[in-house]
């Protein structure tokens, strides 16, 4: 039996991991959350109340939970947690099911992802605020670090750019890609 800890278990990723692994007779799933979440309803084994990753005591608390529950593998289930744990992998008292720190860092930043994939046909053209002219519109702006469509903005006219002046480092401004958006999450 493999003891697998999912944190945070109430995130969309955490719930998907549960759905993917809940019937595997070789896996004992344990859900962990800092706050009360839907994970409480879904996970048979649920632990609540660990500090946030920004706390100085987080790693100590996490390792105690890992040891107390004989955890073999930790699956991080939120973007910031994935990056944080990849940076602290050597401190963990169990295996971590995620990519290396460099890959996690690139994946967390849209700008870094665009830089790595620059020149590929499927990457939209990106702009700096100072380079944009009327003929470039409409455009699309999104935070470099973010998820769930939070902070996105469609730029229809030059005046819309006033909100983004001085924020070239915080936002990615790209050509607007029309049509349906599809998101694919996969855990196998």
Task: Locate the predicted segments by residue.
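ATP-binding N-terminal substructure of ATP-dependent carboxylate-amine bond-forming enzymes
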Residues: 1-100
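Short beta->alpha connector loops
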Residues: 9-13, 79-80, 129, 158, ...
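Flexible, glycine-rich phosphate/dinucleotide-binding loops
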Residues: 13, 38, 103, 147, ...
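Hydrophobic anchor at the start of a short beta-strand
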Residues: 29-30, 123-124, 171
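Short acidic-hydrophobic, aromatic-tinged amphipathic segments that line or gate anion-handling sites
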Residues: 47-54, 126-130, 153-156
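Flexible loop residues that form catalytic
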Residues: 52, 79, 131, 144, ...
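A conserved helix-loop-beta module that forms one wall/lid of the active-site cleft
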Residues: 87-153
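Phosphate-binding site of ATP-dependent enzymes
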Residues: 154-188
């Amino acid at each position: 039996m493999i003891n697998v800890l999912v944190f945070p278990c109430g995130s969309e990723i955490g719930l998907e991991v549960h759905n993917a692994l809940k019937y595997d007779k070789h896996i004992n799933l344990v859900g962990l959350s800092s706050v009360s979440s839907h994970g409480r309803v879904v996970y048979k084994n649920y632990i609540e109340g660990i500090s946030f990753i920004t706390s100085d005591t987080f790693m100590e608390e996490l390792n105690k939970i890992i040891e107390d529950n004989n955890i073999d593998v930790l699956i991080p289930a939120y973007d910031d947690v994935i990056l944080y744990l990849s940076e602290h992998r050597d401190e963990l008292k169990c295996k971590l099911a995620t990519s290396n720190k460099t890959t996690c860092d690139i994946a967390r930043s849209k700008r870094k992802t665009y830089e790595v994939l620059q020149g590929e046909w499927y990457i939209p053209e990106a702009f700096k605020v100072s380079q944009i002219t009327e003929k470039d519109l409409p455009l699309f702006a999104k935070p470099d670090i973010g998820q769930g469509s939070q902070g996105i903005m469609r730029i229809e006219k030059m005046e819309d750019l006033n909100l983004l002046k001085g924020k070239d480092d915080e936002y990615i401004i790209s050509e607007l890609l029309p049509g349906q958006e599809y998101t694919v999450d996969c855990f196998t």
